[in-house]
Design a protein with these regions (language model features):
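Subtilisin-like serine protease catalytic core
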Residues: 1-29, 46-51, 62, 97-100, ...
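Active-site alpha-helical elements of protease catalytic centers
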Residues: 1-11, 31, 223-243
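A Trp-anchored, charged/polar loop motif used as the substrate-binding/catalytic surface
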Residues: 2, 24-43, 122-123, 160-173, ...
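Short, flexible loop/turn elements at secondary-structure junctions
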Residues: 2-4, 20-23, 55-57, 107-111, ...
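Substrate-binding/access-modulating region of protease and related hydrolase catalytic domains
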Residues: 15-134, 147, 218-226, 230-232
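Catalytic-core environment of secreted peptidases
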Residues: 142-160, 164-232
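Contiguous mid-protein beta-loop-alpha structural module that forms a pocket-lining wall or clamp
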Residues: 231-234, 240-243, 251, 255, ...
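Secreted peptidase-domain scaffold signal
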Residues: 279-342
Length: 342
């Protein structure tokens, strides 16, 4: 398992540091995640960060239910400090205001042996992997715009997914119960696979993959990249650029800008128009999340679209004075946009 850390330097340009890959033989995944988070923060405590975690469990048995790993991600994202003990993880609360963290987590991949021509049926039944169901994490699935096969090696093969549709690699939250969060939150480019007339699926096809730098440049400069790990790296890059351009934004605001800058592709909207009923449309949201984020939309208002960002806190419900076990309406914030003057 590797742990990626994404940040921006003091000049405002985003950069990525890849820590050496390491695979612990023992220990809880939640403990490993907490320790990895602590190590980089100790090295440079004042540096702003986005944590990109493109590693998940290999099964989908949790189906949205919390686990010790997803709970640790939720706690770390909320700004809590964790420490390992003989009884597991314990919270370290010193009374200071928590410093929230942005965790960008891959949704997880469909098993290589389970890729099917009947896409996206397999993705819709393969649930997002642990810990990507964490409420406070930005969970990233994959879509693809890559649908042109030119390599002579793949003559007679066609792309599995249509351009603008769900990547065949990406898991979804379609089978989650309604009580659990919508996951993935967003989707980024994750590549495609190829299929032939016999119903066989193959990968990787260079035409349908992304090109990235190899983690050992002395061995080779570039390597093919695909699936939700690639999509997560792209999401982390976008979040780091937003944080670098707007250093005063809260972590949750950066996350919100990524999500609010997303929109469904024309192909995704085709499925939406063909969906009959509210439940069918809800299933599509749990497949695509809120769509594909666009950096320009996050950084700048498009045309005459006004974007108002309010960073504040409130308590929407308060205990009743006469009945403390019951709740009443609490805070509400109003924003005066000014009256139009003739």
């Amino acid at each position: 398992a590797g742990f990626r850390f994404v940040a921006s330097d003091r000049t405002g340009r985003p950069w990525i540091t890849l820590f050496a890959s390491w695979r612990p033989l023992n220990g809880y995944r939640s403990t490993i995640t907490a320790e990895a988070t602590s190590r980089v923060e100790i090295q440079a405590p004042e540096r702003r960060r986005c944590f990109s975690m493109a590693v998940t469990a290999t099964d989908e048995r949790d189906r949205g239910q919390p686990t010790s790993w997803s709970a640790a991600v939720d706690a770390l994202a909320a700004g809590r400090a964790l420490d390992a003990s003989s009884q597991g993880l314990i919270y370290l609360d010193d009374g200071s205001d928590p410093v929230q963290r942005l965790f960008i987590v891959s949704a997880g991949n469909v098993d290589e042996g389970a890729l099917q021509v009947a896409h996206p049926d397999r993705s819709d039944t393969d649930a997002v992997h642990d810990p990507a169901q964490a409420w406070n994490a930005l969970t990233v699935g994959a879509f693809t715009e890559k649908s042109i096969v030119q390599n002579p090696k793949w003559n007679g093969w066609q792309p599995v997914a249509s351009a603008g549709d769900h990547s065949p690699w990406s898991t979804t939250g379609v089978v989650f119960a309604d009580a659990w969060p919508i996951k993935p939150d967003v989707v980024f480019e994750g590549g495609n696979g190829v299929k032939n007339a016999k119903g066989e699926v193959d990968f990787p096809c260079p035409d349908l993959c992304l090109l990235s730098t190899h983690y050992r440049p002395a061995q080779k400069a570039f390597v093919l990249s695909w699936a939700t790990s690639t999509a997560t790296a792209l999401a982390a890059r976008m979040a780091a650029i937003i944080a670098a351009d707007y250093p005063t934004l809260w972590t949750v605001t950066v996350c919100a800008l990524v999500v609010h800058a997303a929109e469904w592709t024309a192909q995704m909207q085709t499925h939406l128009r063909g969906a009959s009923g509210k439940r069918a449309r809800a299933r599509l949201v749990r497949r695509y999340g809120f769509g594909v984020p666009h950096l320009d939309r996050a950084l700048r208002s498009a045309g005459d679209a006004l974007t108002i960002i309010a960073q504040d806190s409130l308590r929407p419900f308060l205990p009743k004075a006469s009945k403390p076990n019951e709740r009443q309406m609490g805070d509400i914030h109003f924003f005066d946009l000014g009256a139009h003057q003739n």
